[in-house]
Curated annotation (Swiss-Prot):
It holds the Pfam family DLH. Keywords: Hydrolase. This is Uncharacterized protein YczH. Transmembrane segments: none annotated.
């Protein structure tokens, strides 16, 4: 009997907050195993109001780099089962980079701003990118244009009329309808991927 597919959640700069816990519960209800590694210090977590401090700590301790290593190690430790990585913001950049690993069946990236620094990356599995309409730190439309010019076979890009945080129930920019729309897209993509992979064994 095959083990359940595994979803690894890569959190934002805030740590394993209530948003990540809610997301984990939703994914478990859908029949998946879930792991949410803490990419910060032990029990370190920030509220959305502590964004400045969270960002300073994340940058100071180079947690994008160490976080990528942590997620990659978790992936390797669970090799042999279907693994999906879902990341938010900086976690989305990690999910994007992990999509080249042979152990990964699919990656989902919510508003991954730093993907713009890794345009050379070549996904080896299906990847879903969810972007807002606007980001203060970069030109979303330009990034999408550059990604589409790469003509990645496995890449699907969605841009919504919403702002960063539209998939976070704790954010003032939360958009319930769009959030559940993305969950539907993820569910359909994951089920399609599992059917495709499973059929190759029979």
């Amino acid at each position: 009997m095959f083990p359940k597919p595994l979803v690894i959640l890569a959190h934002e700069i805030y740590g394993v907050n209530s948003h990540m816990k809610k997301m984990g519960r939703l994914i478990k209800m859908a029949g998946y195993d879930v792991l949410t590694p803490n990419l910060l210090g032990e029990d370190e977590v920030y509220t959305l109001k502590e964004e400045k401090t969270a960002y300073e700590q994340f940058t100071k301790h180079e947690r994008l780099k160490t976080g990528e290593t942590i997620i990659q190690n978790v992936i390797r430790q669970n090799a042999g089962r279907h693994i999906f990585v879902i990341g938010f913001s900086v976690g989305a950049t990690i999910a994007w980079k992990c999509s080249s690993m042979p152990e990964v069946s699919g990656s989902v990236c919510y508003y991954g701003s730093r993907i713009r620094d890794s345009l050379h990356h070549m996904p080896a599995c299906p990847v879903l990118l969810f972007f807002p309409n606007y980001e203060p730190s970069f030109d979303v439309a330009l990034l999408i244009k550059k990604l589409r010019e790469k003509q990645h076979t496995h890449l699907e890009i969605y841009q919504f009329d919403a702002l960063h945080g539209f998939a976070n129930p704790d954010s003032v920019y939360f958009n319930r309808a769009l959030f559940f729309k993305t969950l539907s897209i993820i569910k359909n993509g994951a089920e399609s991927r599992l059917r495709t992979v499973s059929s190759s064994f029979f």
